[in-house]
Amino acid sequence: MGRDTERAISAPAQQTSMKLLIDKAIGLGAADAVPISPGKVVVGNWVRLKCQFGCGGWGRCLTCPPYSLTPEQTSKILSEYKKALLVHSRGSHPSLRKLMSELERFAFLKGYYKAFALSCGPCNLCD
């Protein structure tokens, strides 16, 4: 809590303006949101090690390793998108998960049918 965190929400190339999504993200409580190219996202293999050896939650949540996507799967999925929105928040994981879930739904309803929020940390939305 209190630590800066960043998340990405991917969306397909559509006519809908990314500005609408940026405004919505900020309206939901994000500190900032900027469009990025998914092709510029670097997916490091070392990140999984931080989860495995640095987090007591390893293997306890289906959104975390070893159940989550591998770096290879993540890279492959990102390659299928033309646009992404990097969302910056100073909030905690639970509040940010809710923000991202609402933003993903909003994007989908605006025509970004492949919209999918990606983030780190355990998800407690279904607990």
What annotation goes with each model-predicted range?
Residues 2-127:
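Auxiliary alpha/beta "docking" domains used to position bulky ligands
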